[in-house]
């Protein structure tokens, strides 16, 4: 993942939208549909992106979901994918407000799930 490797070197606050099970990454980087391998990949990816966030400039944020999708271009991703009952759209708005309003700690609590139970995905 090029972006996550570059993230600690970006000199301005940024907001990552990332799925633990990004369909392109699972297919192209992992190359397996084995459930155990995919789950391990998702855990490793989560550790990698949260580590990058911890090394990033203050004000940076992350919306890390556990849904199977690639990119955030579909309208359903903005409205239906949630972490702790916060949609992608709401998390992005929270982050934009936090950059100017000093709410970064609250944003990180809301957008980085602790355990699998914190994430919900829409039914296909």
Where are these regions (language model features)?
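C-terminal His-loop and adjacent cap/lid subdomain of alpha/beta-hydrolase
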Residues: 1-124
């Amino acid at each position: 993942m090029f972006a996550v490797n570059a993230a600690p070197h970006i000199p301005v606050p940024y907001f990552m939208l990332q799925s633990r099970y990004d369909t392109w990454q699972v297919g192209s980087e992992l190359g397996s549909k084995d459930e155990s391998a995919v789950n391990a990949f998702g855990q490793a990816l989560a550790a990698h992106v949260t580590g990058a966030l911890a090394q990033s400039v203050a004000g940076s944020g992350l919306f890390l979901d556990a849904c199977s999708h690639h990119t955030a271009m579909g309208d359903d991703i903005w409205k239906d994918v949630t972490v702790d009952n916060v949609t992608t759209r709401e998390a992005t708005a929270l982050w934009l407000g936090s950059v100017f309003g000093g709410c970064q700690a609250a944003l990180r609590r809301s957008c980085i799930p602790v355990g699998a139970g914190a994430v919900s995905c829409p039914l296909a």
